[in-house]
A protein has these predicted regions:
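Acidic low-complexity segments
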Residues: 2-7, 15-28, 76-163, 201-235
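A generic local secondary-structure boundary/capping motif
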Residues: 9-10, 37-41, 128-133, 156-164, ...
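Structured beta-strand/loop patches that form or line metal/cofactor-binding pockets in enzymes
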Residues: 16-49, 141-161, 287-288, 343-366
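Extended amphipathic alpha-helical scaffolds
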Residues: 23, 31, 124-201, 248-275
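Short His/Asp/Glu-rich catalytic/ion-coordination signatures at enzyme active sites or charged loops
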Residues: 61-72, 103-119, 171-175, 181-200
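Dual-mode signal for accessory low-complexity, basic/Gly-rich regions
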Residues: 259-422
Length: 422
């Protein structure tokens, strides 16, 4: 099919350039209900995304683009019609002209596959989760997915790259059945490789968290507190913090920060070093065909680099570093045990963290947390916290302990000092 698509694109004289993304996914899926296997399924899909570029205007000063998907085999006439429709739509888009990424022949990257059968792997992971259950806390449902995905991109400038990667996704719903009511949580986990010791820890935490949810009470008489974030919330914090430093953000003037400007002023805590990296060696290129290599965005609390797509890099006159999926940050000097030695709020479930550099705001709505008053750990819920982002960054504490997941490498926890509790 990909040859047919490329031939049809080349046949249309109004197509100034093109990009084809072919994604083949082989997914092994297992569904468990009340800790018993219900259904197994194997799904194989092959999908194409075709982006058509059309230069127009005086001296071809503008380039428009339009994308369409192909999920089934099309006749030559159907494909030609889709391309013509995309060209028509692209005529109405007036982006500043830019060049597609240039390539030089085929290149392929591939992660080594697991030797065990995917269903055996998923059963082992599920049974490790179920082993953490107690008489009153168990997993009402668990869905397990093993996906091996091959992505190939070709463009009109000679790019022809292919990468094959695998991952395991788990969606677990732990529940706690108490004498008064039943409560549930939803927990998502992604693994690059099979590490049953890590799975065992994740399962134990999920069961402990749902028990905390059952016992949680309204937080009262705590107007201010240090807040500890962990897990996905740390990743979200870092992504929010550097989100405006993309080429796109700089071009659209979403930030006024220049290279060398301080992100943290008057640092009293840990200086931040944040960047983007590859999830694996096979994660070698981005959606445009830009070759990826680790890049630093913030170093020692200062902005040292932008990042982002080929298009907006050209608008800024910069060499593109690409669009990444995995963020990384340097660890701090403080152990988690030391972080937790003083009174604090440890966030277990957060609806999302919000950061606005220009209004100076940081905050979030908390669904579940643990309040440590210096003596007792008390599960609490139904509140929010907020504070000044500049002050929070100045006093920021990063844990010495780190995690390395698919989308995040860095400190396991961070501590935000003196947040207002609402």
């Amino acid at each position: 099919m990909i040859k047919q698509i490329v031939t049809a694109l080349k046949a249309n004289p109004s197509v100034s350039g093109w990009l084809v993304n072919e994604t083949v996914t082989v997914s092994s899926q297992v569904f468990y209900v009340m800790q018993k296997k219900e259904t197994t399924r194997r799904v194989e899909t092959r999908e194409y995304q075709v982006t058509v570029y059309h230069r127009h205007g005086e001296q071809n000063a503008f380039v428009g683009s339009s994308m369409f998907a192909v999920s089934r085999k099309l006749t030559k006439a159907e494909l030609a019609r889709k391309i013509e429709e995309a060209v028509f739509a692209a005529r109405f888009v007036k982006n500043k002209a830019f060049d597609l990424v240039k390539g030089a022949g085929k290149r392929t990257w591939k992660e080594k596959p697991e030797t065990a059968d995917p269903y055996v792997i998923l059963d082992d992971i599920a049974n490790t989760f179920f082993a953490a259950a107690t008489p009153v806390s168990r997993f009402n449902a668990l869905e397990a997915f093993h996906a091996r995905q091959t992505i190939r991109i070709l463009n009109s400038e000679g790019v022809d790259f292919t990468k094959t990667q695998s991952k395991i996704d788990i969606e677990a719903i732990p529940s706690h059945d108490g004498p008064e009511r039943k409560v549930e949580l939803i927990r998502m986990f992604t693994y690059k490789t099979v590490d049953l010791d890590l799975v065992k820890k994740d399962a134990a935490v999920a069961i402990a968290d749902v028990a905390l949810r059952y016992d949680a009470r309204k937080l009262e008489n705590v107007p201010k507190a240090d807040v500890i974030l962990a897990g996905d919330d740390v990743e979200d914090f870092l992504r929010e913090l550097i989100g405006d430093f993309s080429y796109d953000g700089v071009y659209r003037k979403s930030t006024d920060k220049k290279i060398g400007d301080a992100i943290q002023s008057e640092i009293q805590g840990d200086a931040l070093s944040i960047g983007w990296t590859l999830s694996s060696k096979a994660d070698a290129f981005d959606r445009d065909g830009v070759m990826l290599a680790p890049v630093r965005v913030v170093e020692a609390g200062k902005l040292v680099g932008y990042y982002g797509s080929n298009q907006y890099a050209q608008y800024l006159g910069l060499q593109p570093v690409g669009v990444f999926g995995t963020i990384e940050a340097a660890a701090g000097k403080t152990t988690i045990a030391r972080m937790k030695a003083k009174p604090h709020l440890e966030i277990i479930a957060l609806s999302g963290i919000q950061i606005d550099i220009y209004s100076g705001y940081i905050g979030g709505e908390v669904r579940l947390a643990v309040w440590f008053d210096g003596k007792n750990r008390i599960p609490v819920s139904g509140f929010s916290f907020s504070g000044n982002i500049d002050k929070a960054l100045s006093d920021l504490v990063l844990s010495k302990e780190t995690v390395q997941g698919v989308r995040y490498h860095g400190p396991k926890c961070i501590l935000l000092k003196g947040m207002d509790v609402l």
